[in-house]
Amino acid sequence: MMNNPMMNPMIQNYMGNNMRQMGQMDQKNIGLTRLNKEYQLCSKDMDLIQIGCNFGLENDLYHWRVTMTGPKNTPYEGGLFFISIIFPEDYPTHGPEFKFLNKIYHLNVDWKNDLGHICINSINSWRTSGKVIGRPVYTVKQALLDIFCLFFKQGVESAYDKGMADDYVNNTEKFNEEAKKWTKDFAPMN
């Protein structure tokens, strides 16, 4: 395998070892190549989102941890939010799973049944489509930008909690106060 200066060294080393053992490019190495491309895309022009790969004790390249800062003039201002991205072994055939790791008071984040699950149609359809092979139609960078947009917009139509959605529609000020409180309690910057 040729050395690629643009490739994350850990991914390149992992791929090189696997390819030497197997002598061919299998689904896992296709996924690792795509992961490297995704990482490179996410590393460019993402001032508001910090991408950090948490490789874990076992050098788990399929689990990333992302940090997002709550934007100004939103109830999430001053918050530091962590998102877990778990890529399936058959990536990119199936998309990754995105979850908030710390609590956030938001209509489109589930804290009752599936802790931290994010409901965005584009992410959910990507995860289950099984059709994303080869050139990426939807990327991790786009998914992260979609998640970042959640700080500015609540998706009432896809809210997890009807009571919370009613509060948002009928008393946005009360909703925003609760979101600020959760940000202070569960996502403090310091």
Name each region found by the language model.
Residues 22-28, 32, 36-80:
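N-terminal onset of structured domains
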Residues 68-70, 87, 100:
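Hydrophobic residues in beta-strands and at strand termini
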